[in-house]
């Protein structure tokens, strides 16, 4: 094996440099993940009748319901609006997390990293 490298790689790939790059990427990923966990994502349903705020930890922070949408005879509609807004807020958080991590990893698929 070539000194400081791997066979067939021309000796240009130094394992120490590779490890340093991996550690740096891991630190950057942890930083971005922490920032995303604190970020708030807002989604609404029913033309703004129900608004949900979630964070990057996938915690629902608040649910706002416009009073005029509350109909005791149609609770199911309100439940559907709340569910739709919650799901959209969490989906938006997931998508942004995936996009930010993709930027860091250069598009490498790293399952379980975020």
Swiss-Prot record:
Record's protein name: Nucleoid-associated protein NT01CX_0824
Similarity comment text for this entry: Belongs to the YbaB/EbfC family.
Primary role: Binds to DNA and alters its conformation. May be involved in regulation of gene expression, nucleoid organization and DNA protection.
Lineage start: Bacteria, Bacillati, Bacillota, Clostridia, Eubacteriales
Residue spans crossing the bilayer: none
Superkingdom, taxonomy of origin: Bacteria
Organism: Clostridium novyi (strain NT)
Pfam families: YbaB_DNA_bd (PF02575)
Location within or outside the cell: Cytoplasm, Nucleoid
């Amino acid at each position: 094996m070539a000194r400081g490298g791997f066979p067939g790689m021309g000796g240009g790939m130094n394992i120490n440099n590779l490890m340093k790059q991996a550690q740096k990427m891991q630190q950057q990923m942890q930083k971005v993940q922490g920032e995303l966990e604190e970020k708030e994502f807002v989604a609404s349903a029913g033309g703004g009748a129900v608004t949900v705020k979630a964070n990057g930890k996938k915690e629902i922070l608040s649910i706002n319901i416009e009073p005029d949408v509350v109909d005791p005879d149609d609770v199911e509609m309100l439940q559907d609006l709340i569910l739709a807004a919650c799901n959209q807020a969490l989906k938006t958080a997931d998508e942004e997390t995936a996009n930010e991590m993709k930027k860091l990893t250069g598009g490498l698929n790293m399952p379980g990293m975020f």
